[in-house]
Amino acid sequence: MQSKAHLCPKCGENTIYFDGICHSCRQKQRREEILNLSADEVEAMILKIADRIDEIEKWDEIYNDFWALFSLLGIHDPRIARAAAAAEIYCPPELYFCAPKDVRDALVRKLASLQDNAKNTLNDVLCALAWQGDEQTTQLFYELYQNPKPWRQKLYAGTEIYAQIGGWSFDEAGERKSLVFNKCLAVVRARDSAEKNGGCASERGDENANEILNFKGGAGSANSEQNTQKDVDEISNLHAGAQSARTGMDEDASLRNERVNFKADAQKDASSGLNLSENAKDARCECANQNADEPVQIGRPTGQKCEFCGCEMLDMLRLKADEPRLAFLNLKRDAIFRCCPTCVGSVRYFCKRSPDGEIELSHDGEGFDENYFSQEDFARLCGMKFKLGGEVSPFYGCFSELDTTVGGYPQWVQDAEYLTCPSCGGTMKHLAQIPFGEMIEGEGVIYVQICEKCEVLGGCFQCT
């Protein structure tokens, strides 16, 4: 029996129509369970997944267990990959991330055996190879790009696009380029004391934290056939980052190749005459007070008006270049991605800093004629506080649309959509994933990307 609309009793924010807690809170509970697994429990899950690999395409227990270990703990065990290859199971393709060469060879043999009437299997095997992604796979993809097989005509894209599914690409000369940062940091929301039901779980003690670190050392041996002390140290740091991300929450409660010209002057002119509601004004003041010192800021008002719908533009993401924890991004100056929260669903935005530090904004696509972003959502988003956490698994953002991640791998809702830099024409690199729908009780994800050469930021939006 359907209940009347009410707020989730755990978070006090999301509206639900059933007994229990909202989807976001259930996912957070599941995440907590996985991050607290012992080494023995993880080993048991790995063996169960490998033994019951034929069930993974049912999208039930085995699929969920694999996805949790892979995304939250970064576990990609060769035993699982070998079991999948032996059973000729290729979905999800992440099963084959960094799989050993014998698994790669099995995938290559399968690809060679396929005919042009096996379109779906061709697609699945190419995706699996893209996630395996070693040097020989790169060479194979380049050869298929130069000399396509007859079955290429049956596919929507060539191997140069399939490679992007695995987070890499290659140029006309076959030189490989990574489209992701291997390091990933979580950006967690810090609950304001004035919000309802601000707390989630109680803060964990040192004893439990040590158990997590000890487990991570054991999990490292599952990820590699050669367990080194370096692996243990790196994975222990990963778990410490995941722990700090959770503690932070508890403490504070297809590609387009057309080049576009920057239109800074037009955007500056459009910003004149902006008339904000009282809620929006309050949100701007609150945002300035709450986030000024944070190295990562999300949803900062700008006073600039969208040329399409009239909604206020937001600096959806700001990263401080001088933050030591963000040094792996190699930012030369603060990175700012600005967009309209209404039109980001249909427009790809690009941002570049002018010599005087101003944002030069350009776009690809047409926005909406009407502003659909409510003042309530505007005030809610701009009033949120966020904190930069520690290092987590590179696939942390792939578990669920819960937290913003900087670096790491994106979890595409649809197909991989790496943008083309409007300045140099090169393929941009994934920078951050923002679960926009999670913040406004809606749906969809904003993917922020960067051209390291031109210092241009771009962004696109995907939803189901």
Say what each PLM segment does.
Residues 198-201, 207-211, 228, 232-234, ...:
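Short hydrophobic alpha-helical segments enriched in small aliphatic residues
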